């Protein structure tokens, strides 16, 4: 059976950001994990989700997959149909080598994986969540770059309680149920045997502390939502779906941790005149039959302004010309890409008697020295001249 597209497996767009991919994976991994879902096909679906995430969350593998499809990642990973065993590392799922897989499964199962990583101290400083912002820009703004202001909403440290969540003059107290750990250990019987699972403390909600007198401004959250206005520099040469990171412009951290980052994802409007592929610009230029036959110098629009293009005598329809350095600026390099111009020979719909006579004489003078392509052209020209 043919493998499904990895983006379809996770239910995300091909231009999805890393955070969107991780969010989709977390949701599906929890939904289809064999210990949580005993429906037929859940395990196979779970393997498929893991395989898709393994490729798409890795920038190098994702780039190979985007360029070559399944052939670009064959033999580079996947889960190989391994079973799930238990969680003690005896043939079961292992998070080694998969980056934030362990964090994701920690969200689903706590520390149920035997020998897994210890849970983060809930009272330790934690970086805030990253945010995504989609910016739609015009085609030429993507080529030349610009500065523009954006306004978005993010959480900021509460100015009243300085992020503690407690009313001024009071402090959060250690939770007496979990003793500040934020988790409770629960023993349960499963088809795999008896396992101990750490779950979020139901008294403090995993914070490790309890706020007896909540701050009236943030209602005990430690953060408040505020609108933020930033000036964003759009890099010259940015392409549709690409993103930039603004450090420290995301959500507020916890327990004095740093702010998260803001990712600006660009959506570029198409142009009516130009088409783009990477750093190359494509456009068309109409020329007359006489210009194609005799040669000429024409003005061609580029993304940097009009330039002269020399048309050699005998130019054939749909001939491509390259204008070096007239393409898109290279973001991670110097200079510009190129522009490719395709000339379109335009046959006039109406001509006067003198023009008609001259063209008929030209056709007659050509004799049998007409290539099949030229013959095709002249047959269409005769039809035009004869009013057919």
Curated annotation (Swiss-Prot):
Record flagged with keyword Repeat: yes
Principal subcellular localisation of the protein: cytoplasm
Keyword Oxidoreductase: no
Residue span(s) of domain J: 5-69
GO biological process, alphabetically ordered: chaperone cofactor-dependent protein refolding; DNA replication; protein refolding; response to heat
Gene Ontology terms: cellular component: cytoplasm
Residues that hold Zn(2+) 1 according to the record: 158, 161, 215, 218
Entry binding sites for Zn(2+) 2: 175, 178, 201, 204
Pfam families (alphabetical): DnaJ (PF00226), DnaJ_C (PF01556), DnaJ_CXXCXGXG (PF00684)
Chain positions of CXXCXGXG motif repeats: 158-165, 175-182, 201-208, 215-222
Cofactor note: Binds 2 Zn(2+) ions per monomer.
Subcellular location(s) per record: Cytoplasm
InterPro entries: DnaJ (IPR012724), DnaJ_C (IPR002939), DnaJ_domain (IPR001623), DnaJ_domain_CS (IPR018253), HSP40/DnaJ_pept-bd (IPR008971), HSP_DnaJ_Cys-rich_dom (IPR001305), HSP_DnaJ_Cys-rich_dom_sf (IPR036410), J_dom_sf (IPR036869)
Keywords, comma-separated and alphabetical: Chaperone, Cytoplasm, DNA replication, Metal-binding, Repeat, Stress response, Zinc, Zinc-finger
Entry's Gene Ontology molecular function annotations: ATP binding; heat shock protein binding; unfolded protein binding; zinc ion binding
Cofactor: Zn(2+)
Renumbered zinc finger spans (CR-type): 145-227
UniProt remark on domains: The J domain is necessary and sufficient to stimulate DnaK ATPase activity. Zinc center 1 plays an important role in the autonomous, DnaK-independent chaperone activity of DnaJ. Zinc center 2 is essential for interaction with DnaK and for DnaJ activity.
Subunit record text: Homodimer.
Family the UniProt entry places it in: Belongs to the DnaJ family.
Function: Participates actively in the response to hyperosmotic and heat shock by preventing the aggregation of stress-denatured proteins and by disaggregating proteins, also in an autonomous, DnaK-independent fashion. Unfolded proteins bind initially to DnaJ; upon interaction with the DnaJ-bound protein, DnaK hydrolyzes its bound ATP, resulting in the formation of a stable complex. GrpE releases ADP from DnaK; ATP binding to DnaK triggers the release of the substrate protein, thus completing the reaction cycle.
NCBIfam families cross-referenced by the UniProt entry: DnaJ_bact, PRK10767.1, PRK14276.1
Protein known as: Chaperone protein DnaJ
